[in-house]
Swiss-Prot record:
Designated name of the protein: Histone H2A
Similarity comment: Belongs to the histone H2A family.
Subunit-structure text: The nucleosome is a histone octamer containing two molecules each of H2A, H2B, H3 and H4 assembled in one H3-H4 heterotetramer and two H2A-H2B heterodimers. The octamer wraps approximately 147 bp of DNA.
Gene behind the chain: His2A
Cell compartments where the protein resides: Nucleus; Chromosome
Length: 124
């Protein structure tokens, strides 16, 4: 048994990096895009995993809020209007996406306080 090593290991089914990290977003594709995009000369192994996790979290957060907005409007399909309402009503997402225009999103309903009718007290 000289020079033979410890015996051949049988490799199981290939596991993607997204599976290993427990993510839905494609780690391999993000790694490729980071390398091709000339962001840096070299890209570490953990960078695409971290970026995929952040992107997945943000997408889930926006979809959760947009789904709630759709349900509030008694709709089963998320439309750009629901995305707009979800993002603009959330303080942190609004700050993050302040420079983004959503096509067909409309505007937030807002009436200035001075334009509202004055409440008068009735004396009994």
């Amino acid at each position: 048994m000289s020079g033979r090593g410890k015996g051949g290991k049988v490799k199981g089914k290939a596991k993607s990096r997204s599976n290993r990290a427990g993510l839905q977003f494609p780690v391999g594709r993000i790694h490729r895009l980071l390398r091709k995009g000339n962001y840096a000369e070299r890209v570490g192994a953990g960078a695409p995993v971290y970026l995929a996790a952040v992107m997945e979290y943000l997408a889930a957060e926006v979809l959760e809020l947009a789904g709630n907005a759709a349900r509030d409007n008694k709709k089963t399909r998320i439309i750009p209007r629901h995305l707009q309402l979800a993002i603009r009503n959330d303080e942190e997402l609004n700050k993050l996406l302040s420079g983004v225009t959503i096509a067909q999103g409309g505007v937030l309903p807002n009436i200035q306080a001075v334009l509202l009718p004055k409440k008068t007290e009735k004396k009994a």
